[in-house]
Amino acid sequence: MIHYLFDGSYYGLLTAVFESFERKNFNVNIAEKDYFLGSMFDETVEIITDTEKAKRVLDGLKKKLKSQDFQKIYCAFLSEDQKARNAIFYIIQQLFKGQDAILDNFGDDQILYYHQTLKKVNREKHRMKAFIRFQISN
């Protein structure tokens, strides 16, 4: 298996998506290079963040997704969950391959994990808002 190592930034993830299409490598795993524990038999490719490539992917996502779904992808990225980042990578790849209704396919394990991560992030956001409200009222 091929592993794409990126710096952990959102633009780094989007650059990895661009690179996967450029190199025609679709069955890849992405990981942050600081936390990656490699295997002797796996190939690793270090992805250097390129804002131009990332912006091209962002522009394509804006055209393919509703603004709400576009924001949800970034929200799931903020979870800092490695498996969720792989799910986001997979979702973006499928969107650019032409599967426009990919986010509604709950039969796919990657999509299901993505939605579960979104739910976790939104729950944490709600708790933080409640905590801040509680602090302000005192």
Language model features by range: what are they?
Residues 16-22, 52, 75-81, 115-123:
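Phosphate-binding glycine-rich loops and adjacent basic patches that engage nucleotide phosphates
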Residues 54-104:
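A basic- and aromatic-enriched beta-loop-alpha substructure that forms the phosphate/nucleotide-
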Residues 11-15, 45-46, 69-76, 111-117:
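Short, mixed-charge, low-aromatic patches
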Residues 5, 44, 48, 79, ...:
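Generic amphipathic alpha-helical segments used as scaffolds and interaction surfaces in large
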Residues 1-51:
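N-terminal ordered "arm"
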Residues 97-138:
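Internal, well-folded beta-alpha domain core
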